[in-house]
Regions:
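Buried hydrophobic core positions in alpha-solenoid tandem helical repeats
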Residues: 142-144, 173-178
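Hydrophobic core/packing positions within alpha-helical solenoid repeats
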Residues: 162, 192, 196-199
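Alpha-solenoid helical repeat architecture
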Residues: 146-151, 178-187
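Residue-level detector of extended alpha-helical repeat arrays and alpha-solenoid scaffolds
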Residues: 154-155, 188-192
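Beta-propeller domains with acidic blade repeats across secreted/periplasmic ectodomains
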Residues: 1-145, 153-157, 161-165
Length: 200
């Protein structure tokens, strides 16, 4: 059977070319109303970061352009990656290169810069930074509790730490932690998913 093309989530006026930088807002350092927004970099044409709200849309999602979070006026500005830090601030990587791609320029072009770039830190001054959760060297109990935190990147880093520990140590403790969760508490299913991924 024929499957129709998926609905494009981004409005025509704000579409960007394929990009290597994409992040969902998941930080208590930023306002509540932007949690879950998607941030998308672009390095050709529009040089910057667009922000779109994301909402449930039936069996998928719907989005709406919120703002140009960042726009460069330097023709070499190449935002290529971003990630929320343990303190909730947003770090952005700018490749800052005169050349883009390898179709129109040789990979050996002397103008291709392999060593320079820029890193920006974006904060929301009227809100406090997030207290970083202990991860490296933290107890299993602390790591499991981190899985309840609202910051996706903290949960991600916690899962990576758990995966580096012995299965024989983690799984029995994780099972005890899951069995101790309150099935009627808010976020219960979310915590179960975190435990599943943390024990993988």
């Amino acid at each position: 059977s024929f499957s129709p093309n998926p609905i494009n989530l981004i409005e025509d006026a704000h579409r960007v070319r394929p990009t290597s930088g994409l992040e969902f807002v998941s930080s208590r350092h930023f306002p509540d109303e932007v949690q879950g927004d998607i941030l998308v970099h672009n390095t050709i044409g529009f040089l910057g970061t667009k922000q779109h709200s994301m909402t449930d849309g039936g069996t998928g999602y719907a989005s709406s352009f919120r703002q140009d979070l960042l726009k460069g006026n330097d023709g070499n500005f190449r935002p290529v990656d971003m990630e929320f830090a343990p303190d909730g601030s947003l770090y952005l990587v700018d490749w800052h290169n005169v050349l883009v791609g390898h179709m129109q320029h040789s990979a050996r072009d002397p103008l291709r810069d392999h060593v320079h770039g820029r890193i920006y830190r974006i904060t929301y001054p009227s809100r406090p930074l997030v207290k970083p959760a202990p991860i490296v060297g933290a107890s299993l109990t602390q790591l499991f509790e981190n899985l309840k935190l609202p910051e996706y990147r903290t949960r991600y880093r916690t899962r990576r730490e758990l995966r580096g520990l012995s299965t024989e140590e983690v799984l029995p403790a994780l099972t005890r932690w899951v069995n101790g969760l309150d099935a009627n508490a808010s976020g219960y299913e979310h915590h179960l998913v975190g435990a599943m991924w943390g024990g993988w």
